[in-house]
Amino acid sequence: MIDLASYSYPKGLHLLKSWQAGTEEAKAEIKSVFDAAIAGDFDENFSVLAPADEVHSTASVHMLALAILNDIYGVTSAEYYKTDPYRYVRANLTVGRLLGVKKLYMTWALYAFSCEVLGQKMMYPDKFPPGSDPDEALINKENCFELETPDFSTGIPKIIDDILRVTEELTGMEPLLQISAPYSLAADIYGQEPLLADVVNDPDHVNALLDHLADKVIIPWVEHHLKVFPNGWVELSDASGSPFFIGPENCKSMSIRSIQRMDDGNLWNGRVFDCNYRGDYVANVQSKNRRSRRSSKSTGTSTKVDLNELTDIKFSVCQKFMMRLEADKVDVAFYRDQSLQRNIPLTTGIGSGEVDRNSIENLELAREQLGNAAKDYVKAIKEVCEQIDLPLNNFVNEPWPSHLYFEDLNGESEFGLVELILKQVYDCPKISRPTN
């Protein structure tokens, strides 16, 4: 019998690298690993949680698991995501172990699933995650308020419930539903360009649409999830509604506002959160530009939201931890200080493009830069862990992405860089906390 522990860091990464290179030996070996995984041979291993006295890592790996299963079994995207929850969960958990990521984190094609529930026409490529058909929007300005609450007991919601049941069964971690936030859901079913046009020309309509989606889709789905899984969590995702795409002021007054109004702002005691607003540097840059314009006679308008206010409003919809994503482009020290000020742990992201082998022009330079960045991230995470009121379990039971977080890994990720980054995690001394 294959022992999954024999592929602990960095051996699993070396296997992934050989598989990626296309060697027949590696393909046969990785097939034997996944044969065993899907048969349930590793289920006991999956119940081992990340150590509570260490800085750990998490990763979104569903695209990498799809690439492997498509290569070794010919499993298509639709089959992978929608037909066998045990295969799906075991494959994703196995990929996490091969990578050397100690905190398990279950993800799927959440933007696609969220709009497919409503009847949006989808595209399912064989080897890649699904997406909405951009040429056939589900709703428009004339009919958007006719959208009603879907049935959460069947179809995509049931598929997700089954994945979460299996994940909880195998890992013991609390179930985490991942769905689109109102703005990103609107972008997928209304169309990015029409929605952006209305952001500029008809903001009242946009806010009414976001509230309608929240009331008819998001809130009922949250309530369904928490009824099925009373210990559950909900991660809303809103990349399209981020400061980088629609600006800090619109992010505040539209995207985040539509979440803040849910559950009177309590967000089910913080168990509903959105941690993926990206592009914080936009607020920082625009704030500096505003100060420089004060000495000029320009009457042009500028954002009213600076980096500190943006952080405040992001915290209002992600109350349990502080997130710094790669696209934020703000020094990690700022997020370290914000975490300490708010007495919450810090998560720092490694962007998918940073470790994409097709995007890296100079691998040695990338190794140097990412190695140094990862060292800074791990140092900041450890400092926060040692200074805040951290529970004894270090939140390893909670299902959110924590500590060093690979935002998306796939079949084109440069596994040598992943190994280099994770070395900083593995080399980090244990967390030292004062004892009473």
Which sequence ranges carry the predicted segments?
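Active-site loop segments of alpha/beta catalytic cores
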Residues: 1-82, 102-106, 149-436
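Membrane helical hairpin/interfacial module
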Residues: 84-124
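A gly/proline- and charged-residue-enriched helix-loop-helix capping module
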Residues: 127-165
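Flexible glycine-/small-residue-enriched beta->alpha junction loops
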Residues: 125-130, 134-135, 182-190
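Short alpha-helix boundary/capping motifs
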Residues: 123-125, 195-196
